[in-house]
From Swiss-Prot:
This is Uncharacterized protein MG342 homolog. One of its GO terms (cellular component) is cytosol. ATP binds at residues 117-124. It comes from Mycoplasma pneumoniae (strain ATCC 29342 / M129 / Subtype 1) (Mycoplasmoides pneumoniae). Pfam families: FMN_red (PF03358).
Length: 166
């Protein structure tokens, strides 16, 4: 198991401010970065699951378990995670390699959200993901809200916050 943190980017926009933050974390923390958009699959449906469980989801869950610490970086879309990310997470919950609904079992995690708004759904996203990921076996070490983002924004204080949680 790698001691190098694994960053999971839950944004699918090429110009996402969350991508910028994830890349800054990757460099400063000497972490590995994967983008959930690379693991997109069909919209979850029980019928699809019975016919063929996506191998790329099984592979992704195994990759998560190659690391002790996960750092989730997500935008907020109307107070929730992006739809494509929610779908991929739904599929991951159906993978029983580590127990029913335990795809994050025995892993440590930090959840981050970057938003341009001073007051936003970012806090709600962090609360929801903290509860959900805890239910899925993750030991949530903390959450970092980066709000009020603008051009020229300094991520360093927030990177330091993440470092303290690792």
């Amino acid at each position: 198991m790698s001691t190098k943190p694994l960053i999971l980017l839950l944004a699918n926009s090429k110009n996402s401010i969350n991508r910028k933050f994830a890349k800054a974390l990757e460099q400063q923390l000497n972490a590995e970065l994967i983008e959930l958009v690379d693991y997109q699959v069909d919209f979850y449906c029980e019928d699809l699951e019975k016919d063929h469980f996506p191998e790329k989801i099984k592979s992704l869950v195994r990759k998560l378990h190659d690391h002790k610490t996960l750092i989730f970086v997500t935008p907020e879309h109307n107070g929730f995670v992006p739809a494509f990310a929610k779908n991929t997470i739904d599929w991951m919950t159906r993978d029983t390699q580590y127990g029913k609904n335990q795809f994050l079992k025995e892993l440590d995690g930090i959840i981050c959200c970057v938003t341009p708004a001073a007051k936003s759904g970012g806090k709600t996203v962090l609360e929801l993901l903290t509860k959900f990921f805890s239910f899925s076996g993750l030991n949530v070490k903390g959450a970092v809200l980066v709000n009020g983002y603008h051009d020229g924004f300094d991520f360093q204080p927030f990177i330091t916050d993440v470092q303290k949680l690792i």
